[in-house]
Amino acid sequence: MSGFQQHTGLVVPLDAANVDTDAIIPKQFLQKVNRTGFGKHLFHDWRFLDDAGEKANPEFVMNQPRYQDASILLARENFGCGSSREHAPWALADYGIRVMIAPSFADIFYGNSINNQMVPVRLTEQEVDELFTYVHDTEGATITVDLEALSVTANGKTYHFEIDDFRRHCLLNGLDNIGLTLQHEAKIAEYEAKIPSFLK
């Protein structure tokens, strides 16, 4: 995986609190276990007016022309609540979302997002309100997120966020659980070489 240092992107404002993982990716699309192909089903029941996903809902924010190709999702509190399905961050990432900004995220969803190289940014409710106003009032509104500086810059103003050092290290260096393990490949090989043959 490639690391995340800084990203500037178009913002889509999802003005809803307590968005759960079943809304992000409904259960009927969970049959696959690889990470790709879920983006087309993201927010299926909100984006589409039919079960086949062929008739777009023009009222849903992600279908509006001004928000096409957005890579930053702005949301309200407790985003990603509900079941722990990792398909939710898979769908967001496959759709093209790199950063999510909200006052709070469900704990498991927060960790799963980082494991999939997306940056969940927690700002205060007041700061998120300011960003919603900026995005609503400004067509083509962009935000820059700098993971090195732990900053969010929008409309000439800079906000700061926190993320623990270990998770920040993983994001900066593009490390998931497998990547972290492979950092110790030499020690693993050394250990395996010492295992008696009857245990192999």
Curated annotation (Swiss-Prot):
<protein>
    <recommendedName>
        <fullName>3-isopropylmalate dehydratase small subunit</fullName>
        <ecNumber>4.2.1.33</ecNumber>
    </recommendedName>
</protein>
<keyword id="KW-0456">Lyase</keyword>
<dbReference type="GO" id="GO:0009098">
    <property type="term" value="P:L-leucine biosynthetic process"/>
</dbReference>
<dbReference type="InterPro" id="IPR004431">
    <property type="entry name" value="3-IsopropMal_deHydase_ssu"/>
</dbReference>
<dbReference type="InterPro" id="IPR050075">
    <property type="entry name" value="LeuD"/>
</dbReference>
<dbReference type="Pfam" id="PF00694">
    <property type="entry name" value="Aconitase_C"/>
</dbReference>
<dbReference type="InterPro" id="IPR000573">
    <property type="entry name" value="AconitaseA/IPMdHydase_ssu_swvl"/>
</dbReference>
<comment type="function">
    <text>Catalyzes the isomerization between 2-isopropylmalate and 3-isopropylmalate, via the formation of 2-isopropylmaleate.</text>
</comment>
<dbReference type="InterPro" id="IPR015928">
    <property type="entry name" value="Aconitase/3IPM_dehydase_swvl"/>
</dbReference>
<comment type="similarity">
    <text>Belongs to the LeuD family. LeuD type 1 subfamily.</text>
</comment>
<dbReference type="GO" id="GO:0003861">
    <property type="term" value="F:3-isopropylmalate dehydratase activity"/>
</dbReference>
<keyword id="KW-0100">Branched-chain amino acid biosynthesis</keyword>
<keyword id="KW-0028">Amino-acid biosynthesis</keyword>
<comment type="pathway">
    <text>Amino-acid biosynthesis; L-leucine biosynthesis; L-leucine from 3-methyl-2-oxobutanoate: step 2/4.</text>
</comment>
<keyword id="KW-0432">Leucine biosynthesis</keyword>
<dbReference type="InterPro" id="IPR033940">
    <property type="entry name" value="IPMI_Swivel"/>
</dbReference>
<comment type="subunit">
    <text>Heterodimer of LeuC and LeuD.</text>
</comment>
<dbReference type="GO" id="GO:0009316">
    <property type="term" value="C:3-isopropylmalate dehydratase complex"/>
</dbReference>
